[in-house]
């Protein structure tokens, strides 16, 4: 019995198994590719390799892939669905689909909602790239404030939010982002 949030794969001599936790906290997807099957945490990974018949594996289910094909088996009874909110706002790529929704569209709608709930008198809307870009665009669309870049991201620095300590997070952010000070100076800026 496994308690907690997980999506996992197990490879045996006769089959490949994919298991999603009963809450659906972490995503897991299945698709057909080159006459076989592929499993990934996000739909975008399957799209990239040309997979078809892409589907999300339901919470609590086990997929068994063997020479006869792929079967969805009963696993743990599904609990109350509880996908991690960080999948929508941070972890998932914008071109992935979670719970039938394109992440890019979800993030833009969150930005529009943020603009409705927290309007601002500003000259520019900018994002902390890359996860917040779609939300910042949504904020700009809803508010009528122009969107522009204000931070340049060092693409060689990995995720900073998930570092184990504040010191490492702060050091990572300092290396990862550089503001366009000349463009921002004297402006009232909404940072999403």
Q: Model-predicted segments: where are they?
A:
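Generic enzyme active-site microenvironment
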Residues: 19, 191-192
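Secondary-structure boundary/capping motif
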Residues: 114, 187-188
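N-terminal segments that mediate ammonia production and transfer
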Residues: 1-132, 140-181
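Short, flexible hinge/linker loops that cap or flank conserved catalytic cores
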Residues: 183-185
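Structural motif
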Residues: 124, 188-190
């Amino acid at each position: 019995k496994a308690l907690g949030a997980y999506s996992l794969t197990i490879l045996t001599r006769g089959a490949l198994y994919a298991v999603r936790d009963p809450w659906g906290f972490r995503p897991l997807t299945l698709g057909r590719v080159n006459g076989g099957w592929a499993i990934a945490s996000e739909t975008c990974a399957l799209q990239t390799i040309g997979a078809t018949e892409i589907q999300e594996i339901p919470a609590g289910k086990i997929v068994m892939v063997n020479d006869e094909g792929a079967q969805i088996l009963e696993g743990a009874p599904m609990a109350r669905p509880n996908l991690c909110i960080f999948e929508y706002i941070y972890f998932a790529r914008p071109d992935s689909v979670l719970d039938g929704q394109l992440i890019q569209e979800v993030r833009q709608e969150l930005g529009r909602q943020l603009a409705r709930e927290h309007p601002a008198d500003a000259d520019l809307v900018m994002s902390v790239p890359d996860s917040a870009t779609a939300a910042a665009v949504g904020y700009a669309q809803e508010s009528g404030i122009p969107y522009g870049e204000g931070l340049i991201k060092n693409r060689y620095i990995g995720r900073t939010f998930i570092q184990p300590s504040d010191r490492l997070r702060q050091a990572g952010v300092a290396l990862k982002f550089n503001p366009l000070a000349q463009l921002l100076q004297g402006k009232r800026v909404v940072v999403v």
